[in-house]
Amino acid sequence: MIDETLFDAEEKMEKAVAVARDDLASIRTGRANPGMFNRIHVDYYGAVTPITQLSSINVPEARMVVIKPYEASQLRPIEDAIRNSDLGVNPTNDGNVIRVSIPQLTEERRRDLVKQAKGKGEDAKVSVRNIRRKAMEELTRIKKDGDAGEDDVARAEKDLDKTTQQYTHQIDELVKHKEGELLEV
């Protein structure tokens, strides 16, 4: 019962870190990166679909992304979705592919993006702490019901704290890395 609780908590924390990693990847840096487009969706025959599933995304140069839709009819919707996103880029459509030139980030925009990255990191850490809190409540319930001894529960609580620290540290490292990418000129 205790092991199950710890395993579930660790699994959920791992997912929270994965979500944070994806969130941070979607914040654009000064370089072209296909991950920037992970959060952009297009209405594809009535279904909201990520553009990563509707096209191939290549980075031929450091500041250029080329998006080639699998269907030519999706050129305009993909272009519009990118233009309306919060990436701050202006795609051009040559009838065959969509080219997205990544402009140089201004110092002010870099600071805003660092704030955004820190906010996403903090959200992920809150999520990890909430998972810890729920697991602690479950451990308290196990102890109260007499399903496990006090020593076992205390040891499990210590393990849970170590796991929580490990995952919050991972999130801090992800944010620090992203901050370095953003501030690099």
From Swiss-Prot:
Keywords: Cytoplasm, Protein biosynthesis. One of its GO terms (molecular function) is ribosomal large subunit binding. The keyword Protein biosynthesis applies. It is found in: Cytoplasm. GO terms for biological process: translational termination. It comes from the Bacteria. Its main location: cytoplasm. InterPro entries: Ribosome_recyc_fac (IPR002661), Ribosome_recyc_fac_dom (IPR023584), RRF_sf (IPR036191). Pfam families: RRF (PF01765). GO terms for cellular component: cytoplasm. CDD domains: RRF (cd00520). Transmembrane segments: none annotated. The keyword Glycoprotein does not apply. SUPFAM superfamilies: Ribosome recycling factor, RRF. Belongs to the RRF family. Responsible for the release of ribosomes from messenger RNA at the termination of protein biosynthesis. May increase the efficiency of translation by recycling ribosomes from one round of translation to another. This is Ribosome-recycling factor. The gene is frr.
